[in-house]
């Protein structure tokens, strides 16, 4: 587990700078542009500004359905896991917001050093360009998981209390569970569920809650495709299911979709096809956990749903800030 650490400058900034924005309805375009500018430099914003930004994000996300309806063209991105400088590399190769429409398939946080900056930047971009930045929920957008895999600890280090973590986890509950592009490409973080035959069944789930330990909502965020598997199998993850080619074919036919696009699993080549190109895994965290040596990928779908993959490597060392190895806060928090 790669625990997040903060540099002294960011810690001081987060605790000392006075906020400039009030309630979410007063969060102006200027405020959002200022937040985006700071976060693009991997600098923290003040705690009160986090609260306001999260409230604004919840307002926007609350208006979106469980299955986000998205028009092409769009660029699909897999797991990011707090690898901020690699997210900057993704935007470099994929194009800046709002020039490019993005759909991120969840797992924004945990394991990487900069989950706070990564998630807040994506939220600020969502608040500023709500129709250009689409975010759905991954299995790591969970209170329980983030207390184990780094995001909670990072919030405590960088802000000195759990308030920012609480604000962010409240946003998690409002994230959509899936998306469908032009009615033909079904997108989800993990995979399918034996409890779900149609997208309409996803649309009626009460998503505004912590990720359950089992059931359809859990399955969407945790399941994996399994080559050679027939029907459904128990997942070694302890949540969700393994689903085979037959389950994928049945779902696609019932919902008139051509492709199931998901993330959730490390792919050394950045993307991987399953089941005669009915299911696709996209992975967007290069050199995962700063040691796996994998490349990353994003998938661009044009107006006709033609596919173009862009492969990219981890950001060069000179482009990334080195987090402090042992911040003094470690001894006191």
Curated annotation (Swiss-Prot):
Q: Where in or outside the cell is it found?
A: Cytoplasm; Cytoplasm, Cytoskeleton, Microtubule organizing center, Centrosome
An annotated GO cellular component? centrosome
Q: Provide the record's note on post-translational modification.
A: Methylation at the C-terminal Leu-333 is critical for interactions with regulatory subunits.
Query: Where is the major localization of this protein?
Result: cytoplasm
Cofactor note text: Binds 2 manganese ions per subunit.
Which GO terms fall under biological process for this protein? cell division; chiasma assembly; double-strand break repair via homologous recombination; embryo development ending in birth or egg hatching; regulation of meiotic DNA double-strand break formation involved in reciprocal meiotic recombination
Q: Where is the active site?
A: 140
Q: Name one GO molecular function term.
A: protein serine/threonine phosphatase activity
Q: Which domain of life is it from?
A: Eukaryota
**Cofactors demanded by this protein:** Mn(2+)
Binding residues for Mn(2+) 2, per the UniProt record? 107, 139, 189, 264
Positions that bind Mn(2+) 1 = 79, 81, 107
Recorded catalytic reaction(s): these are: O-phospho-L-seryl-[protein] + H2O = L-seryl-[protein] + phosphate; O-phospho-L-threonyl-[protein] + H2O = L-threonyl-[protein] + phosphate
Signal peptide as annotated in the record: none
Biased composition, class Polar residues, residue ranges = 7-27
Q: From which residue to which does any coiled coil extend? A: none
Q: Does the keyword Cell division apply?
A: yes
Might you give the EC number(s) for this enzyme? Answer: 3.1.3.16
Residue positions, PTM Leucine methyl ester: 333
* Gene3D superfamilies associated with the record: 3.60.21.10
- Keywords in alphabetical order, please: Cell cycle, Cell division, Cytoplasm, Cytoskeleton, Hydrolase, Manganese, Meiosis, Metal-binding, Methylation, Mitosis, Protein phosphatase
- Protein's job: Protein phosphatase which plays an essential role in meiosis and in early embryonic mitosis. During spermatocyte meiosis and the first embryonic mitosis, regulates centrosome maturation, and thus spindle formation, by recruiting some of the components of the pericentriolar material (PCM). During oocyte meiosis I, regulates meiotic chromosome dynamics including synapsis-independent chromosome pairing, restriction of synapsis to homologous chromosomes, programmed DNA double-strand break initiation and crossover formation resulting in chiasma formation.
So what family is this one in? Belongs to the PPP phosphatase family. PP-4 (PP-X) subfamily.
Q: How does it assemble?
A: Serine/threonine-protein phosphatase 4 (PP4) occurs in different assemblies of the catalytic and one or more regulatory subunits. The regulatory subunits are likely to be ppfr-1, ppfr-2, ppfr-4 and smk-1. Interacts with mei-1.
Please report the name of this protein according to its UniProt entry. Answer: Serine/threonine-protein phosphatase 4 catalytic subunit 1
Q: Which organism is it from?
A: Caenorhabditis briggsae
